[in-house]
């Protein structure tokens, strides 16, 4: 049962967990990209646990799809503002390595295309920017 008062601290606690769990997949995604020249298609190709096994108190799952790491919040036990909502971590090539971003959910359609760094907004299930930590407010156009 949730406490009656739900301040911003409790919202951020769920987001912090989502970011920590998603960040735990970054090194595997980066390593895959640097070794193969393309983003991993899914959790298996990235060499991480299945989405349903990367969970937490507030996080339902963490999915790797075309190199984008997306955490989905639980639909219960969290504030209504983030119930079932998502945030993403994604990277772009930069000087022989990769630069990571964090923000509202994005998707990458084609991992083998020349523009395989491009991501676009994933329209559904966004956590409103005001409920995201200041360190996780990048947009799909971030560089």
Where would I find each of the regions flagged by the language model?
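Periplasmic/extracellular, small/polar-rich flexible segments of pilin-like filament-forming proteins
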Residues: 34-143
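Conserved hydrophobic/amphipathic alpha-helical signal-anchor segments
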Residues: 1-4, 9-52
């Amino acid at each position: 049962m949730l406490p009656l008062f739900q301040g911003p601290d409790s919202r951020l606690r769920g987001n912090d967990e989502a970011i920590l769990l998603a960040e735990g997949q970054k090194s595997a995604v980066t390593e895959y990209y640097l070794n193969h020249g393309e983003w991993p298609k899914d959790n298996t190709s990235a060499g991480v646990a299945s989405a349903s096994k990367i969970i937490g108190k507030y996080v339902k799952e963490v999915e790797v799809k075309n190199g984008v790491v997306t955490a989905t919040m639980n639909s219960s036990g969290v504030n209504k503002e983030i119930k079932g909502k998502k945030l993403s971590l994604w990277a772009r090539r930069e000087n022989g390595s990769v630069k990571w971003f964090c923000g509202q959910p994005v998707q990458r359609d084609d991992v083998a295309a020349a523009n395989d760094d491009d991501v676009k907004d994933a329209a559904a299930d966004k956590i409103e920017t005001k409920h995201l930590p200041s360190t996780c407010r990048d947009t799909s156009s971030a560089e």
